[in-house]
Amino acid sequence: MLDAYLVPDKTTVTAKGDGPLLDLGALESRVLLLELKISGAVEQESIEVSILGGADEPGIGKLPLASFPQLFYRGDYPLLLDLTAVPQARVLRAHWEVNRWGRGSQAPWFEFGVRATEVSPQLLKEREAGTRRA
């Protein structure tokens, strides 16, 4: 079961950038729970985090497989990424854009991390069975 960071926890950024490459290996379910944790931020700024994927590093596309909404505050933000329709995706990488406006320094500052955890096939089966009964 995959449990890894697309962006290491408490990474500090002041400009747009990319996280390290994450090799997906042999996923059982091809469904990931992505957790964006913003542990530090200043006022009047935003961050947008998207997840890019492909067969290998040169094959990572420009269009995201998933994107968190534009965020402004500290907190934990979950997002499910279903890769069943993208069988060629073997590696993932996080990309972020930051922006700051208003008074004071115009340099944005965020401290955050993005964790990817594989959702177990058993849990997916249980949820699917529960949905059919409802």
Where are these regions (language model features)?
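Local beta-strand/beta-hairpin segments that build beta-sheet-rich folds
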Residues: 1-14, 21-24, 62-69
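Contiguous beta-strand segments within globular domains
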Residues: 15-36
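Extended extracellular/luminal ectodomain segments enriched in beta-structured repeat modules
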Residues: 26-33, 44, 88-91
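Beta-strand signatures of extracellular beta-sandwich domains
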Residues: 48-52
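Beta-sandwich interaction modules
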Residues: 66-104, 110, 114
